[in-house]
């Protein structure tokens, strides 16, 4: 079976080139044409997909060459884009930049190559003309199968684009699809795109409407769709895990303004395995969902909402009792900090939180242990026996006095590692974010523990 998925990737020579803005504007422009859009972010970033979903209104997921192999990438693409008229992949960093200097592993290029997705470059055209051809040709020809098919000149007037386009197309063979003017309306000031309240969503959505109008006027969207239609069919079956036998356990998933960083593929994996997801708010709810058989506390910004979290004593107590009763619990990054005794806010004030784990956290002042890690368990636990290997990602500013030591985290391709995380037969908690399609046995272990807990309670 093969799946036809018209698609293209928005990529760039470097970070800060305008990929996210152009991606969001194109998604809105395509949606306004009546097209059903699916969005993907290349790499482990969970903030841009959240922005795609909450502000642009497109379903979105991740495609990551470190986490998964090429067939799995294609299977995830097939599932995430099922029923869509077009899929838009947003690149990360520079097109060839990956997990380490000197290699293109885990880069946007790798995702484009392995999924055979046509690439549209966003290139800053200000103050250059023929030199742009050198940049574009260099990217298009640097490694094989780059599949660069189009370019949009950012921060460039229509006149400058028309002047530069013939030379670019002559020397590169890449179609110039149009320009984005140097317009203050065509920007998103905050790179912390996950920090959007309900009111901000409405305001940002209105701005993206204006961006979409600009794109329709200055970019050849019809030609872009023609390029998307040249993408080969995906031969892999859509990604799906087989359900486990037994009860249909309820997994309570924390989701509100404080906890929102989840890979959509993780939630789908748990549902595939037979779990029922019940979302709750540690900020606003007073108790866990009825029948909860497992807890999933994801990342987010608990430090920005710690006063409200701390003042919600009934929920803190409900979570503490659940964890101490042995309910299977996964707590990642912000969820991990919530389980500890205290969190300091941005002004250094300490607030008591759940207290199921020792430790307190505060702002470390900089990113710590940022990037991909390969985890190896040092003891038996919820995710598997000692020696279980897991691929994950870290991104956090807050530091804990008790980060745990039940796993060893190793930076890939680097001689750097550290102890991290806490695990027991019913708990795994720490800073790393785990991507279940990279580690399906880990997802099965969590779902199986939830099902066993539900069975014991049913017969207990």
Where are these regions (language model features)?
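ATP-dependent carboxylate-amine ligase catalytic core
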Residues: 2-115, 119, 123-150, 158-162
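Structural motif
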Residues: 9, 88-90, 120, 152, ...
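Internal gly/pro-rich beta-alpha loop/helix module
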Residues: 129-243
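Phosphate-binding active sites in nucleotide-utilizing proteins
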Residues: 247-313, 317-324
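Cysteine-nucleophile active-site neighborhood
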Residues: 302-381
């Amino acid at each position: 079976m093969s799946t036809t998925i018209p698609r293209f990737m928005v990529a760039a020579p470097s970070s800060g080139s305008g990929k996210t803005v152009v991606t969001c504007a194109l998604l809105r422009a395509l949606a306004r044409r009546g097209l059903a859009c699916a969005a993907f972010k290349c790499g482990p970033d969970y903030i841009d997909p959240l922005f795609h979903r909450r502000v642009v209104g497109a379903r979105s997921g991740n495609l990551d060459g470190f986490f998964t192999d090429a067939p799995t990438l294609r299977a995830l693409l097939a599932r995430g884009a099922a029923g869509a008229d077009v899929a838009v992949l947003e690149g990360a960093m520079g097109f060839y930049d990956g997990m380490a200097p000197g290699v293109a592993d885990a880069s946007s290029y790798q995702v484009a190559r392995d999924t055979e997705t046509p690439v549209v470059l966003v290139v800053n055209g200000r103050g250059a003309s023929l030199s742009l051809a050198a940049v574009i040709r260099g990217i298009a020809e640097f490694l094989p199968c780059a599949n660069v098919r189009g370019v949009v000149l950012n921060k460039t007037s229509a006149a400058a684009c028309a002047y530069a386009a013939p030379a670019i197309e002559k020397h590169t063979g890449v179609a110039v699809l149009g320009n984005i003017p140097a317009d203050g309306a065509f920007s998103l000031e905050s790179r912390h795109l996950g920090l959007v309240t309900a009111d901000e969503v409405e305001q940002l959505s209105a701005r993206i409407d204006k961006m979409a109008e600009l794109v329709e006027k200055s970019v050849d969207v019809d030609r872009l769709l023609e390029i998307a239609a040249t993408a080969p069919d995906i031969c892999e079956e859509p990604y799906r895990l087989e359900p486990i036998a037994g009860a249909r356990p309820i997994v309570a998933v924390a989701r509100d303004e404080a906890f929102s960083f989840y890979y959509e593929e993780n939630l789908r994996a748990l549902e595939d395995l037979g779990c029922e997801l019940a979302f709750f708010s540690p900020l606003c709810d007073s108790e866990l969902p009825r029948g909860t058989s497992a807890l999933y506390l994801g990342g987010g910004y608990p430090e920005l909402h710690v006063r409200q979290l701390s003042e919600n004593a009934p929920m803190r107590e409900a979570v503490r009792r659940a964890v101490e009763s042995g309910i299977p619990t996964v707590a990642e990054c912000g969820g991990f900090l919530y389980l500890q005794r205290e969190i300091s806010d941005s002004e250094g004030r300490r607030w008591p939180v759940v207290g199921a784990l020792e430790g307190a956290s505060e702002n470390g002042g900089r990113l710590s242990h940022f990037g991909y890690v390969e985890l190896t368990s040092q003891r038996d636990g919820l995710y598997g026996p000692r020696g279980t290997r897991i691929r994950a990602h870290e991104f956090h500013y807050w530091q804990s006095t008790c980060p745990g030591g039940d796993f060893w985290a190793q930076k890939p391709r680097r001689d750097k590692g550290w102890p991290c995380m806490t695990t027991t037969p019913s708990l795994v908690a720490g800073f790393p974010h785990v991507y279940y399609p990279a580690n399906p046995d880990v997802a099965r272990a969590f779902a199986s523990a939830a099902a066993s807990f539900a069975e014991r309670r049913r017969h207990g």
